[in-house]
Amino acid sequence: MSAGDARISAFDHGFLYGMGLFETFRTYGGRPYLLERHLRRLAEGCRELRIRYEPDAERLEALIRRTAEANGLPGDAYVRLTVSAGDGGLGLPAGDYEEPQELVMVKPLPAAAPGLYERGRELRLLRTPRNTPELATRLKSLHYMNCIAAKRELADTDAAPGAEGLMLTADGRLAEGIVSNLFFVADGEVRTPSLDTGILPGITRERVLELAQAAGHPVREGRWSWEALLEADEVWTTNSVQELVPVTTLAGLDGEPAHPRAGRAAGPVVRELLAQYREDAGSRPSADT
């Protein structure tokens, strides 16, 4: 259906209380990459929220394909799958949500800035801290105020167009970007903040860790300061739509510039892993095994 024909109840608890989850990913040649992993994370989150929803990969892949074709996007596209708790009336529930709403949206991939994957982009340190997850593991939930506040803070700075913002934990440790996970190379290791910092367990983050290990790079998850990032040999961010984006400019709270040792071009490790990621995305069947 067209966007104008879509309807959600005013009593849907996704609307009233933010009870819902979503997954964002992309297609390569019409095939959703790592779909099974996205659906697994979605199903686990629904169980945490007591939303009765078990995704069917085959049915959803067909639905994504039809929606993409209806939008004239049979090849590469941006996909968002949302599951909302459904109609629950006014008041907080005590039981399970039995009739969730499912929504698939497809749009063109956002255009990347010229030279983005060769020359990289700016990563700006923000004052907005990454909030503490409401449950043991951060869910990709409809509660997005923290990220919106961070996005607005970034927009109010003099950061370069296309820059990403970096949030720290409440105790000042590296967390994640507004819409991305963070990686860096130091002392010969590929490093990324650990999940106990409260970051989202990103699907692309998970795959990049696997690719790095398979390529023979030592990997480590941990807790590091902003100063550790300033000493890094390479820095990049990951998400399912933008893939791996090199960071070649680091800027502090008031815009003071600092540069990773890799300078103003993508470093060798991120170039290698991006090539492997794209090869994997292009050759892998849509149902990840």
Question: Across the structure, where does each feature detected by a protein language model lie?
Answer:
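Conserved alpha/beta cores of soluble small-molecule-handling proteins
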Residues: M1-L166, A170-R173, L209-T289
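Short beta-strand/loop turn elements enriched in aromatics
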Residues: L125, L200-P201
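Glycine- and Gly-Pro-enriched alpha-helical subdomains that act as flexible
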Residues: G165, R173-L195, P201
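Catalytic subdomain that performs nucleotidyl-dependent activation
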Residues: T197, V208
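Feature captures the catalytic cores and cofactor-binding loops of soluble hydro-lyases/lyases
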Residues: G202-R207
